[in-house]
Swiss-Prot record:
Lineage: Bacteria, Bacillati, Actinomycetota, Actinomycetes, Frankiales
Gene Ontology BP annotations: translation
Cellular component terms (Gene Ontology): cytosolic large ribosomal subunit
Subunit structure: Part of the 50S ribosomal subunit. Forms a cluster with proteins L14 and L19.
Keywords: Ribonucleoprotein, Ribosomal protein, RNA-binding, rRNA-binding
Pfam families for this protein: Ribosomal_L3
Region described as Disordered: 137-156
Record function comment: One of the primary rRNA binding proteins, it binds directly near the 3'-end of the 23S rRNA, where it nucleates assembly of the 50S subunit.
GO molecular function annotation: rRNA binding; structural constituent of ribosome
Protein name: Large ribosomal subunit protein uL3
Homology family: Belongs to the universal ribosomal protein uL3 family.
Length: 234
């Protein structure tokens, strides 16, 4: 399997705000406190069969971790971390245990995927949970306007198929929003300003990594600029 050079960081979602770009247009952004992360393990094809780097984020009292975890951190020569994540990347050999990573690993304009735990919505019906249309508002429909309708025939198939979309608990699940653009990087405060919304509540843990799907070249090519007195030929 072909693996590219990826960049990634664990961070905390601080909330949303809006900023202005160079053209004085309002841009909605999510502020992420990215890192600092520390490299806790480096995996290579020779020792582990694949290339990856393990990152740790957030302090934790050493008394609150078990002996295997304590030994794992001691081997890397770092203090215990609350959260761990593995980033598969082809250039894992360029990392070393104990190395600290900050938001500087990303540049302005980088396309990223952001993973987090979505907000819990509680028990929800099929219209909210799955986007069902529901039944009619009139024409003899009685107290069944938001019901899913038939879930299966009584004789054929005589059962309810597995995986049928029904009402149930909604949200509080691992969710990834792909193809977001980093609007700005604040290296002094360690902030990433990501254009658009990301999963999870304020204060939630998020993982920012290089986009798995590369954008089309024409989507990222810089616009041509025309100087004073120049004309654009068709």
């Amino acid at each position: 399997m072909l693996i590219r050079n990826y960049r990634g960081l664990l961070g905390t979602k601080l909330g949303m705000t809006q900023v202005w770009d160079a053209n004085n247009r309002v841009v909605p952004v999510t502020v992420i406190k990215a890192g600092p992360n520390v490299v806790t393990q480096v995996k290579t094809p020779d020792s582990d069969g694949y290339s990856a780097v393990q990152l740790g984020y957030g302090e934790i009292d050493p008394r609150k971790i078990n002996k295997p975890a304590r030994g794992h951190f001691a081997t890397s020569g770092v203090t215990p971390r609350r959260h761990l994540v593995e980033l598969r990347t082809a250039d894992a050999g360029n990392y070393r245990p104990g190395q600290e990573l900050t938001g500087e690993v990303f540049a302005e304009g980088t396309v990223v995927d952001v993973t987090g735990t979505s907000k819990g919505k509680g028990f929800a019906g099929v219209m909210k949970r799955h986007g069902f249309k529901g039944l009619g508002a009139g024409h003899g429909v009685e107290r069944k306007h938001r019901s899913p309708g038939s879930v299966g025939g009584c004789a054929t198939p005589g059962r309810v198929f597995k995986g049928l979309r029904m009402a149930g608990r909604m949200g509080h699940a691992r969710t990834t929003t792909p193809g977001l653009t980093i609007h700005a990087v604040d290296t002094e405060r360690g902030f990433l300003l990501v254009k658009g919304a990301i999963p999870g509540p304020d204060g939630g843990l998020v993982f920012v990594r290089s986009a798995a799907k590369r954008p089309a070249p024409e989507a990222i090519a810089p616009a041509a600029t025309v100087g004073a007195g120049e004309e654009v030929s068709a």
